[in-house]
Amino acid sequence: MPATFQELESNAALNSCENLELFCKAIGNSVESIDIYVPQIALGSGAASQFLDTGEKIQVPMTRLDDFVDDKGLTRVDFIKADIEGGELALLRGGEQLLTKFHPTILIEIVDIHCQRFGHSPEDVYNCLVGKGYTGRHITAQGELVDLDPRHLPNGNFLFEPQSS
């Protein structure tokens, strides 16, 4: 997303962020170029999607999280923040080695309608993380952490932390 990425670069420079590398890439479970449609009107969010049929069509490189970590020679990953409009399960599947090796804390947005566009459910994302040894809690609008009932997952932001050994 060139315009969005340029804005991110400007903000990083404006705030004198020194320990930061920025990459204009999509993260998923394969390595390829993908088309993303960026809405022409500001929706107040990063609503770019592979599934919009209007807006500016741009092509971006996509990589797997595991490949990115290997390519960069990272020896530590503590935290992952993901708000990728339904691509969360693809991100997790493309980062299975990272999750097993580093056990990062994960802040992730999960919204049912976005998951449906990618052919899965919020429960699939939840089950993927629980199956990798994570415990999840919902972050309420007031910022409180609430234990989850996997049969009734709300839309919103979730904090997943690795279970203690």
Language-model-derived ranges and their functions:
Residues M1-S165:
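Phosphate/nucleotide-binding beta-alpha loop and adjacent structural elements of enzyme active sites
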